[in-house]
Regions:
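Nucleotide-activated chemistry modules centered on ATP-dependent adenylation/adenylyltransferase
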Residues: 1-237
Length: 237
């Protein structure tokens, strides 16, 4: 539930577009820990959802039957990686996005009337993604010529801008392989418990993938940030 999705809701209300309910799918790290950056999860449940409900909207919360950790530790059954743990998802081919977010939404959509239309939070300056919209998917941001920066302003005006946008211009799971360096640094500095969870997964043997993303292992980022802090400490002495 990022700025583009919330800006879509605001536009729908402003322009009296039909809107039956808000569907939010929460990706989970394990059965207890959310995949949302903690500050963002607090924003969703304590600010965004109450605001939506006060506006008279029904909010449907979905979760997949599987989690990031279960996908990570699942044993590959065939192919050259047979017998290994799946390990870190591949950038550009993220099985977590597919299994933990897309599938629950698709399953829920099948329970709705066939003519149900889905609003998707894609701004006018995301043309590559807009080109991939499927039948019965609509971007109100495109329809009302709203860019990503304008979506940011709209959410800010209505008190619906998540605090994660203080340190990143995107919204993703805290274990996402597309996470930027500032996002990872924020996790390292402010959520050491979650950081340790990822280091524990990195330490598991017999993984099909060892790198967290295209460039580095998660443990490499741990060394990087540790060295940065040590250097800063040396300069301040």
């Amino acid at each position: 539930m990022g700025k583009d999705s919330l800006a879509t809701v605001i536009l729908a209300l402003m322009h009296h577009e039909p809107l039956d309910e808000i569907v939010y799918c929460e990706v989970m790290f394990d059965k207890e820990i959310s995949g949302e950056v903690p500050e963002h999860r607090t924003f969703i449940y304590e600010t965004a959802i109450p605001w939506l409900r006060r506006a008279g909207l029904n909010v449907k919360i979905l979760r997949a039957n599987t989690t990031y950790k279960e996908c990570f530790t699942k044993t590959i059954q065939r192919g050259k990686g047979k017998g290994k743990l799946k390990g870190f998802p591949l950038c550009g081919r993220c099985n977590i996005q597919r299994d933990c977010k897309v599938r629950p939404i698709q399953k829920y959509m099948k329970s709705l009337p066939q003519d149900t239309q889905q609003y998707v939070g894609l701004a006018t300056d995301e043309q590559d993604r807009l080109m991939r919209l499927q039948e019965k998917q609509i971007s109100l941001l495109e329809q009302y010529a709203c860019s990503e920066s304008e979506a940011w302003e709209l959410c800010h005006r209505y008190g619906l801008l998540s605090p994660v946008y203080d340190f990143t211009d995107r919204n993703g799971c805290w274990f996402c392989p597309n996470a930027t360096l500032p996002e990872l640094r924020h996790l390292y500095d402010h959520h050491p418990d979650l950081w340790r969870e990822m280091l524990a997964l990195q330490a598991l043997p017999n993984k099909a993938t060892e790198k967290f993303n295209r460039e580095l292992r998660f443990s490499d980022y741990d060394i990087l940030f540790h060295n940065e802090d040590a250097q800063l400490c040396w300069f301040t002495q």
